Structure formats: C-alpha cells, structure tokens
C-alpha cells in the first residue's frame, strides 16, 4: 500500500526507524540537558510522593474527576517559580500547542507565527489556516510589516520559541517590545528548549531577557527536556487559563496527565530549584569545552553542525557512534539542510564532552562537507 513512498524515503536517505541504541554510547542526542534522567534518588522521591495517595492513576479528564492534588501542586509550584498568575497542565508540548492555537484563535483573532516554530504548532495552524500569518525566522522587520498590514481591530497572537529546537537560536527581546506597543497583542512563547538552559537561574527566555511584566504573555513550558519527565504546562493570566480550561479540546477530552509523570516532574523540579546555580555552572563548563575545541558558541543546551547532504550527515553520525558517541542526525523535511544536532547533558562528564569535541574536530579535518551551523 505504501511501498513506493517507503522506497522513495530509502532512496533519498530519509527513511527513519525506531532503534534501541547501545546503552554504552554516550548520549549527546537527547534533550536531557541537566542529566536528571539518571538520578535514581529523584525517581524514588517521585515514587514516595505517589505512594502517599490511595490512587496512582489519573482515571479521567481533569474536568471530570482526574484532577489530582499532585496536579494542583505542580501547577502552583510552576506559577510561583515562573511568576505567572495561573497555570494549566497539558499532556505534552504537542497538546499544549494544539490547545493554544485551536482555542485562542477565536473569530476576531489572528496568529503571527515564526516560520521555524515547532512542528506541533505549525500542524495546529492547519485547523484555522485563514487566521494564520507566518513571518520569517526571528525577523522583527518582517513581523512589523505583517502586523502593519493586518486589520487593526483584530486580537493578535505572536508565536515564537524561546530557543529554537533545530538551530539553537534565541528569540530576541524585540518580540516583547512589539506586544507592548501593539494594542490587543499577546506573545506565545514555547519554552521547551529554553527552560533549564538559558537565563540567570536557567528559567528560560523571559528571565534571559529580564522580562517581568507578563500580563500579555502566554508561556508553554514542557517537562520532557531539562526536567526529564513528561507533560507540559501553559502559564498565563488567569482569564486565559480559565478560557483554555473551558474551551481547549486537548484539555477537556483527554485523560489527565499521568500521576507518576507529575510526581517525577515535581521531584525533578524541587532538585532543579535547589541546585540551579550549580547546574548552570556545570552546563557552562561543557559549553566552554565546545567553544575552546571547535570554536562553536553554545549559549543554549545544544548546537548544530550543517552538512551538504544526507549521506554525509549519516556518515558523520556513524563515525561518532564508532567513537562511542550518539548524536542526533536531523534530516529534511524537518530542517532545510541536514544537521548534526549535538545536545549537551550533565549526565556526561567533562572528559566525555572533551573527547566528543575532539572527535568532531578530527572528522571536520577529513570531511570537506562539514561546517559549523
């Protein structure tokens, strides 16, 4: 039925498969930036939290009887830590983007979305394509022009990522300035890859840019990257959260977030809050090694290296696997150019990162198709 499509994917080196990798490989492919996924004491803490309750399953939607004290505690902790009026748990970052875009785009609203926004957001715009306008990646001038051309009486949402998941670029402060000077405009910030990697206390894009006023900001924070768990949370003014609670299909018509994941997120969050300065210092040491060895600045939790074609990219990935390192090989159509995506993780030692950097340096000397992205 799909044989020709699959053959075509094989032909252009875009075929993908699930794979169980050798556990002895050093992991530089995942989004476990702070290395929390291997801390068994935190897993035990999460289990102990859950054991104290009679029920260990969410059972139903949050709007039936699936809302649990652990859910409420996590929402309160995040709202307090990130200084938002209210918070709402969702099942994943994908479901969070779906909730925001499907629900907030009421009849008189427009969405202006960065062209490099996460695939879950771009997919969600297909529900209401006539209300969506894309602007060039991190291009303030292009956004301003499109806002100028839009009807003045419309409610406007601007969707960006704090740190873009495929190129590691950080969204500029200018986006905040735009919503401050534009009537009826709100900023949606997907902080999946910025929370835990940037900011004075690793709290993400808003802290990085020292943004305090959040009455026109909607933040989507996921738990599956730096917090090494699963799920996500929307943080926003109370009225926005109430509206999402009452209208978002991916909140109303789905089972509440797993209680084990919620407990694990709480355990990891508590550790993060207590150790954030030490975690930041350790992450900066790994970043410094990459800069000193490869000349690549890494202000976030990962960096990318561009390749001319898919075979060259896969050859580089194989070369590194033979050296004992697992890195991400990101191919079109996910990205326009093949990218080696190298994630830093505190579960790896500084010596591991030094060895990886040297392996990349060795590869670059023998492969002309390699260049830093």
Swiss-Prot record:
Keywords: Acyltransferase, Biotin biosynthesis, Pyridoxal phosphate, Transferase. InterPro entries: Aminotrans_II_pyridoxalP_BS, Aminotransferase_I/II_large, AON_synthase_class-II, PyrdxlP-dep_Trfase, PyrdxlP-dep_Trfase_major, PyrdxlP-dep_Trfase_small. One of its GO terms (biological process) is biotin biosynthetic process. One of its GO terms (molecular function) is pyridoxal phosphate binding. Pyridoxal 5'-phosphate binds at residues 93-94, 165, 190-193, 222-225. Its EC number is 2.3.1.47. Pathway: Cofactor biosynthesis; biotin biosynthesis. It comes from the Bacteria. Substrate binds at residues 16, 118, 334. The modification N6-(pyridoxal phosphate)lysine is found at residue 225. Its cofactor is pyridoxal 5'-phosphate. It holds the Pfam family Aminotran_1_2. Coiled coil: none annotated. It catalyses: 6-carboxyhexanoyl-[ACP] + L-alanine + H(+) = (8S)-8-amino-7-oxononanoate + holo-[ACP] + CO2. SUPFAM superfamilies: PLP-dependent transferases. Homodimer. Belongs to the class-II pyridoxal-phosphate-dependent aminotransferase family. BioF subfamily. Catalyzes the decarboxylative condensation of pimeloyl-[acyl-carrier protein] and L-alanine to produce 8-amino-7-oxononanoate (AON), [acyl-carrier protein], and carbon dioxide. This is 8-amino-7-oxononanoate synthase. It comes from Helicobacter pylori (strain J99 / ATCC 700824).
